[in-house]
């Protein structure tokens, strides 16, 4: 073989080896680019949910830029298709992961515990809300107990007083006091004038028994005996200052019987007005006398005086 033939053979082998090394380098570059693109796609898809088509276009552009020569399109095309498949599968996996994360977050948001926490957020309190509302259940239970005891007492033939509800309301009572100290002027007046009993009206506030009932004389018109204008009754027991939740209605009535006798109460034979006592008059008179006695003190008669 001549030297020229040897040079041609060597040149041909160099070209073949040069093309092979270029193809290997291009394949390695394409593989690295695909890996980088897949990583970028996972980040982008997790944040923005981009489409796999964009990744395929990027892979194709990178492959086209990395190849040259006549043999490059065929080999590069194979790599590009493979890279596109890899990018597509990676992107779809990232999209699925993003969907799963969003679904998990939505599930947490829509969970019963989350909804309950959202529904039961505490509203800002106001000064009005800080004031405790009266418990009507306590008042009702206490009055039912008191009323049953009254019915038991008035079932006796010699009952000192009787009780009936006003308009079937448990919170308003009419009490008829039948028995007064027989040696008192008031008892003699009742016998002479044919008055069978002293009619009292009691109304119980919302916060009873922690506040006293309001009691007034309805009839007859009584002078002195700590009975004021409008039938108001001057008794410290009926004021918030003198009241205790342990007091019973029976004790209040018996205290009145003692007070009216101690105060020399008499039935008015010629009353100043023929009109009946009204609740409004009694309330106004009671407020006035409470102010007076808070300034000068109270005098409470003993129960034995009645």
From Swiss-Prot:
GO terms for biological process: protein polyubiquitination. Pathway: Protein modification; protein ubiquitination. InterPro entries: UBQ-conjugat_E2_core (IPR000608), UBQ-conjugating_enzyme/RWD (IPR016135). Its EC number is 2.3.2.23. Residues 22-41, 53-77 have a biased composition (Low complexity). Residues 18-77 are annotated as: Disordered. GO terms for molecular function: ATP binding; ubiquitin conjugating enzyme activity. PROSITE patterns: UBC_2. Pfam families: UQ_con (PF00179). One of its GO terms (cellular component) is nucleus. Keywords: ATP-binding, Nucleotide-binding, Transferase, Ubl conjugation pathway. Residues 138-299 form the UBC core domain. The active site is at residue 234. It catalyses: S-ubiquitinyl-[E1 ubiquitin-activating enzyme]-L-cysteine + [E2 ubiquitin-conjugating enzyme]-L-cysteine = [E1 ubiquitin-activating enzyme]-L-cysteine + S-ubiquitinyl-[E2 ubiquitin-conjugating enzyme]-L-cysteine. It is an enzyme of class 2 (transferase). It comes from the Eukaryota. Catalyzes the covalent attachment of ubiquitin to other proteins. Belongs to the ubiquitin-conjugating enzyme family. This is Ubiquitin-conjugating enzyme E2Q-like protein CG4502. It comes from Drosophila melanogaster.
């Amino acid at each position: 073989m001549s030297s020229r033939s040897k040079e041609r053979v060597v040149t041909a082998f160099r070209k073949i080896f040069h093309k092979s090394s270029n193809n290997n380098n291009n394949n390695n570059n394409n593989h690295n680019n695909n890996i980088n693109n897949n990583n970028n796609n996972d980040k982008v898809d997790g944040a923005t949910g981009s489409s796999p088509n964009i990744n395929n276009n990027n892979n194709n552009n990178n492959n086209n830029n990395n190849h040259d020569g006549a043999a490059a399109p065929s080999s590069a095309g194979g790599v590009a298709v493979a890279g596109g498949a890899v990018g597509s599968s990676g992107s779809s996996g990232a999209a699925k992961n993003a969907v799963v994360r969003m679904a998990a977050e939505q599930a947490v948001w829509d969970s019963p515990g989350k909804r309950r926490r959202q529904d039961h957020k505490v509203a800002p309190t106001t000064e009005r809300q800080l004031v405790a509302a009266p418990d009507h259940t306590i008042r009702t239970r206490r009055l039912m107990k008191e009323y049953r005891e009254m019915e038991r007492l008035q079932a006796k033939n010699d009952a000192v007083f009787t009780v009936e509800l006003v308009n079937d309301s448990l919170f308003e009572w009419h009490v008829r006091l039948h028995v007064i100290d027989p040696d008192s002027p008031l008892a003699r007046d009742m016998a002479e004038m044919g008055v069978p009993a002293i009619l009292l009206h009691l109304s119980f506030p919302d916060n009873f028994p922690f506040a006293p009932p309001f009691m007034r004389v309805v009839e007859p018109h009584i002078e002195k005996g700590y009975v004021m204008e409008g039938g108001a009754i001057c008794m410290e027991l009926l004021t918030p200052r003198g009241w205790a939740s342990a007091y019973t209605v029976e004790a209040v009535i018996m205290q009145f019987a003692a007070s009216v006798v101690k105060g020399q109460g008499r039935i008015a034979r010629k009353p100043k007005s023929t009109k009946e006592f009204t609740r409004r008059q009694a309330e106004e008179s009671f407020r006035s006398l409470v102010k007076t006695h808070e300034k000068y003190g109270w005098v409470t008669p003993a129960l034995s005086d009645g």
